[in-house]
Amino acid sequence: MGLLLKMKMQNQHHPLASKLQEQTGNKRYTFIQAHRAWLLKLMFLWILLMALISRIIYSKMDVGTKVRRKEVLGSLCDQRARMLQDQFSVSVNHVHALAILVSTFHYYRNPSAIDQETFAEYTARTAFERPLLSGVAYAQRVVNSEREQFEKQHGVVIKTMEREASPVRDEYAPVIFAQETVSYLESIDMMSGEEDRENIMRARATGKAVLTSPFRLLGSHHLGVVLTFPVYKSKLPPNPTTEELIKATAGYVGGSFDVESLVENLLGQLAGHQAILVNVYDVTNSSDPLIMYGNQYEEGDVSLVHESKLDFGDPYRKHQMICRYHQKAPPNWTALSTAILFFVILLLIGYILYGAGNHIVKVEDDFHEMQELKVRAEAADVAKSQFLATVSHEIRTPMNGILGMLGLLLRTELNSTQRDYAQTAQACGKALIALINEVLDRAKIEAGKLELEAVPFDLRSILDDVLSLFSEKSRHKGLELAVFVSDKVPDIVMGDPGRFRQIVTNLVGNSVKFTERGHIFVKVHLSENRKPVTNGKHETYRNGGSEEVVHASGGYNLKTLSGYEAADERNNWDNFNHLIADEEFFCDASTKKVASNEFYEQVTLMVCVEDTGIGIPFSAQDRIFMPFVQADSSTSRNYGGTGIGLSISKCLVELMGGQINFISRPQVGSTFSFTADFGIFKKNPITEVKKVNYEDLPSSFRGLKAVVVDGKPVRAAVTRYHLKRLGIQVKVANAINKAVSLCGKNGASSTGLFQPDIIFVEKDSWVCGEDGIFSVRQLDWKQNGHIFKMPQMILLATNISNDEFDKAKSAGFSDTVIMKPLRASMVGACLQQVLGTGKKRQLGKEMPNGSTSVRSLLFGKKILVVDDNVVNRRVAAGALKNFGADVKCADSGKAALEMLQFPHKFDACFMDIQMPEMDGFEATRRIREMERTANEETNSECGERKSEFHLPILAMTADVIHATYEECLKCGMDGYVSKPFEEENLYQAVAKFFQTKPTSVDS
């Protein structure tokens, strides 16, 4: 009743319950129901709003059209400006060439090769190269002192532009050579005009072409300009100064450009030139621009103009072209029609919405009722999940009491029948609590209450433990069960070891259940080394494929772990060997791991579980991850199970930040793979992880050499992986004769030969050489000089009969037979027995002497058990007393504080987490505070630092999720032990407090 009342109070505060109460207590109206009178007003508002939007659309489109019109005008204007500039540049180059001609043949040669007749004839015949020039002429530079001599020599009088005798000046520039079209310029002083004089002086000072301002040309009365180039009487230095240029100047070549004709010809060559109007200006004086072409009066569309710069080669003068459209832009009918169409469409939409609003008002009451029913259903579903998740502790507690009492009962004196009954009840209880745990885990996931731990753990040790769970079943079926972890995977990762173990256990358990021959292979590597398995493979078989599979060549020669075909064809020896080669390409594996720890905060691992079982029918593959779903009804009848394991595994994988997929082929097998994100543990893995999950493998085998004889390369690589974990150097041979050849002949001590200390022979390889061949190889070994270094012979077998065992002994395997699946700790224990190295010691999670070791640790120790449940106290006290401990009990945290007042004689305390009044966390915090106070008083009295009081406190919990590793450490606990007490868990919990640390063996 108390539990139900507690659940009821919790549900009353649930958001869905509150929502349901609000809806049932007060009927809520939606916006449309509450404002139905506003529907007509909203319709008018909609019309106004759509009219405004249509106006905005028209404006946007009209602006876009104007922008495009402006861009077109700019493009056309720039095109004309470039063409005018290019044609002008060509004519300028011809005038420059004429200036060089005069300089070369008139001044560089003596006597001159040019006279008026020659110049006139040459310029007339080459006039086609200067179509833009009305004429060219050459004016000689004459200083005042040379004027009289010049006039006598040429028989002329230097005149001004007005045809009058030129007055006395410092310098003159009379024309001596002229084209026939401008013959009227002969003897006229080109420097008689003020502007002309400045242009000529600027030309000789710069050595470049100069232009005059626009003026009316004689004869044509068109606007034009005069281009002037200096002519030099001697060659100039590479970089002449202004004085050198003026001194070397002998005359000037000039040409007149008819700008109006030039632009008219240019525009006539362009299509559509009537569309725009062009004006050319001299803007040297920006305040008073001079027109060179075009109408001075504004015509056309003056609202849009474009200016293009012109460069005629004279940096002093600036010119530009201004363009505008000949006609104004027409109305934008496209924008107008689009805006009107948009307005009409939106008006229709508004009318439809108005009608829909009226209809919604009518059906809103029905919708409100349906919504209320939906909330009720959701509240009931959440209440169910919340109830199951909340009572998980209460359900587990009596079950743990039953299992604990059965465990204590089995330690008493029982006859065979009683022991059989008790063992059967214990097995059924464990199966029941496992099923309860799965159902509660699913409920926690649905309720969103499942939390993941983040503690350091040894992933390889976890996988070895999973294999040990199914070792008996795999041996009974004759299955190859193996695990392989890439060297790139860190030794220690941060994550939830329990949930990781649960996922792998579910997948391996399913594989063992549905596999009758072949193998089950677990592989772990970094996700970057392998593309994830997708469901695309079985789609290929589904589309046109059959569920009947034909095995290749009898199905027992494929390069897989067992030789049977696997569902995922990528898991063959070639890809597996490539993965191993990638690992060995780098340097030492530990160096790689340290490097990875320095640059990455987390690592993504991919775990593949491959089997050669019955596979999954294609019709069931789409729903395989649904809860409580199996392939068909016959699966449950033949194999048992609830169909919830894969569903929970999928949820756990997603909580770990990964994905789970599979490839399955009926009668071939299945390959499940999942990825998961783990943190990288950067602290000292030995000192920190020993507290939780760390497999302390022996180091006494480092430096030993071994040969693995196995004809299956994948299986040999797995054996090599486990031996490498023990520090053994390994070579692989596919036959015993190859193993002998590895060591050479007649000289085992020769340099460079591989002298093995141990030879591991797979049972298959031994059976192949059973008829005397193996003994012959041994004799050959002895005859080849190995008589004093005969290695230890160890046989590896999945299962072996008594007859086969006797034959193995007679064949030379007198040392031992290791039964698979292989685990590093188990192999290490066997090697210690075979080689006689070291004493028996703890290997991973295996206790050296079973209950005797726990008894040796706990015998005579005074231990306090704190738990509010009397059954739990009796179970814990009984288990600890069975191991020789002196146990006292307390039923609450307050009672524990009273019993632990200093001084006390307790060696350890087992503390329950969930207790009334004061839970285990709060009790632990207060105990640690009492210890700090006692330590301070002791140190102050003694004057020196003594050993501090620290009572080992271990959390007792039936649900580790509520007592995570971080929470235990935060409140001061030293670890936890799960209920009910089992020897393995109890040994791990107390060993580090009561056992002296073993001395390390140097490698």
From Swiss-Prot:
An annotated GO cellular component: nucleus
Keyword Glycoprotein: yes
Compartments in which it is found: Endoplasmic reticulum membrane
One Pfam family recorded for the sequence: Receiver_CRE1
Span of domain CHASE: 110-322
Domain spans labelled Response regulatory: 705-835, 862-994
Disulfide bridge partners, by residue number: none
Main location: endoplasmic reticulum
Residues that, per the record, bind trans-zeatin: D196, L218, T228
InterPro entries: 2C_system_His_kinase, CHASE_dom, CHASE_sf, CheY-like_superfamily, HATPase_C_sf, His_kinase_dom, HisK_dim/P_dom, HisK_dim/P_sf
Catalytic activity: ATP + protein L-histidine = ADP + protein N-phospho-L-histidine
Control of this protein's activity: Activated by cytokinins to initiate phosphorelay signaling.
Membrane topology type: Multi-pass membrane protein
Alphabetized GO MF terms: hydrolase activity; metal ion binding; phosphorelay sensor kinase activity
Post-translational modifications reported in the UniProt record: Autophosphorylated predominantly on His residues. Activation probably requires a transfer of a phosphate group between a His in the transmitter domain and an Asp of the receiver domain.
Residues recorded with modification 4-aspartylphosphate: D912
Binding site residues for Ca(2+): D867, D868, D912, Q914, D959
Quaternary context: Homodimer.
Function: Cytokinins (CK) receptor related to bacterial two-component regulators. Functions as a histidine kinase and transmits the stress signal to a downstream MAPK cascade. This protein undergoes an ATP-dependent autophosphorylation at a conserved histidine residue in the kinase core, and a phosphoryl group is then transferred to a conserved aspartate residue in the receiver domain.
Name this polypeptide is given: Histidine kinase CRE1
Encoding gene per record: CRE1
